Structure formats: C-alpha cells, structure tokens
Amino acid sequence: HLLKKPYDFVGAFKTLPNSLQLLMVHSAQSLAFNHSLSCRMESGMSIIEPVEGDLVAPILSNGRIDVGKMARVSSTNLVRCQRNCELGRLAVTGILPGSDSNHASCEPGDFEVQGIDAAGLSDVDWVVKEIPRLTTSGTRRALSVPFRDLTIEQAPETNDLFNRWEEGPLEGDRWHPEGASLRLRFTLPAGAYATVLMREFMRSPLDHY
C-alpha cells in the first residue's frame, strides 16, 4: 500500500485485520501498565496490599475484576480494603490509559503518570479520529492475579517432550540433563498468561520455557 501511496499511513494501517489494529492499541496500553507496575515494584511498594490512593476492584468468580465497582482507598477504608485484598475479595488495580482514564491518586497515581511517560504516551489522547472504533476510554487491570489448583509431577518418558530432553542442553541452555523433567498444572483467570507464571517459577530466559 505504501509503495503506491507513500504517505497514506492510515490507509496502510487499515489494511491490517481489525483484530490486529485493536491489538496495537491494547499493546500501547499494556506498555504503559507495565512501566507503571515496574515503577511501583522498584519503589518497594506492594502490588497486593493497597495503600492510600489506590483503586481496588472486586474479584469476580471467574477471576476477572469488576471495574464498574472500583473504590478509592483512603484513610477511612484502608484497613477494610487491605483485609479484603488479603482474603482475595479485592485486587489492587493499575491503569490501562485512555481518553477518560480513572487514575489512582497519591503515590500510586504518581507511578501511573511515570509509567505513561516512560512509555512515551503522555501526549496521547487516545481518540483515533481516522478510525473511531479504535478510540478507547481506558480501563484498569489487576496488578496481580491468583493461580489455583497447582500440581507438580515428574513427566513420564513417554511424554512428547522427552525427545527434547534426550537431546540434552544446547549452547546457551541453563538446564542439566540429570535434572528432572516436570509437568506443572494450574488454573489461571481468563486473560492471564501461563508463560508469565512459568517464568516466575523457573527464573529462566524467555526462550527456556
């Protein structure tokens, strides 16, 4: 498209499937979320226990959060919110920015502003006039998600992955052939990635799981 119309960037973008166009917006939002989360973690502030200024949301039975029933943590409800987070009823949330974003306040809000700035999105209004369906008002996402039903067992030799085990470690690999080949099973809420949890278990490079 750009070969025929070198400056028609919007037209070129529209040649992508609608799902990929929307994914670009979601990716930008997630980048800001990740930077904000990193700022918070680097400060030593908990991502599980709320502090004043946080926005907390109820956790639904499917593990998702109800963003329509969020509450702002203040000095008057801090202890109650902390207790409900500890019991798994509420989750501390982070921002997925948009045209009408609901920001946290106090120090958690500062981390969100820093994250959006680090992502290079401070001047973005999230209103896509050329492709209105990509305009987003923004929402929030839980800073942490629970996992359930964890089981660990040694993988049998008949497992499909055993051939890879027999080949042994390749150059740059960080596992030992005399170790154990394990199978982990667990349940995550919809939208959570098993590979992310496995990275936390394994503490390995991205190409090792």
Q: Where are each of the predicted segments found?
A:
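Non-catalytic, substrate/partner-engaging modules appended to enzymatic cores
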Residues: 1-209
